[in-house]
Amino acid sequence: MKKVIALVLALVMVFALCACGNSAPASSDSSAKKEALTFTTGGEAGTYYAFGSVLAQYVSNNTDLSVTAITGNGSKANVEDLDAGDVQLGFCQSDVMSYAYDGTNLFAETGAVGSFSVAAALYKEQVQIVTMNPDIKTVADLKGKIVSIGAQGSGVYFNAIDVLGAYGMTEADITPVYQSFGDSAESLKDKKIDAAFIVAGAPTTAIVDLSTSAQVYLVSIDDEHMDTLLASSPYYSAYTIAADVYGTPEDVQTVAVAAVVLVRDDVSDDDVYTFVSTIFDNIDAISEQHGKGAELSLEFASSMTSVPYHPGAAKYYEEQGLTIPDYLK
């Protein structure tokens, strides 16, 4: 009898060990599928964070790729975080992206950054000159005024300098302050500043929130100075912000740069392919969650020419019938 009991116990132990052995690989396979990427965006009051969060959540909910959106400190800082390996994806203005890759302008002192490539260009972000003073009608009217021009060394800062320069003005012609979008909006509301440069996709959360409590005005760039500005930089394009976006008295003419998602070169081709394809195969669904989704297009996504595309992104675009030149692969 004792032998029978011992035999039964031995068999139970064998079955238990087999069950444990069989379950381990299944768990391992499951965890291996869920790759994790961190996506640095922008401040909470800007479009980068709002839209980036939508994209990250959509990809995470519909694929085996986990993407987490975090707040960021602007294009230059996002490039630096990518280069340091602290994040794998990051929003960046197209002009700042080129400065980083070439080691010019904002990156002249630190040198070229070669650790990133393009995942997709998503939409145009406008240089918005915001004021609550109806007497400020042109850029020239900013002379002698207190103006927020973004953090020193940021993309916004250089955009502001470019616009002022088109009018023959410099930073010395204004009283500059260096604030984020959200802080600029608060300062405008409290009448601590006269105007602010905000470079983000319209409608921008900070400006929308401001417009709910008071009348806001956007300063237009006239045709003559628009031509000067466009001739000075290949990264700008003319753009009109319709009056109904913020409830301004009239449409406003300004310039725009592209909002681009950059990715570290060492992220796998499969992960980048999944990220890009999930976004552009589901534009309608994403548009229901954020207005910028309606601006997504494959043609614009694959239109960058100054920085190479990640192989995973290039593969997807070419499968859709688009051509990525060899020098951009």
Regions found by a protein language model. Name each.
Residues K34, D64, G74-A77, A84, ...:
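Extracytoplasmic
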Residues D183, D190, A200-S213, L218, ...:
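An extracytoplasmic/periplasmic, membrane-proximal ligand-sensing/linker region
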Residues K34-N61, S66, K124-D190, S303, ...:
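Bilobed "Venus flytrap"/periplasmic-binding protein-like clamshell domains
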Residues S53, K76-Q88, D162, G182-D194, ...:
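Short helices/loops that flank or line small-molecule/ion binding pockets
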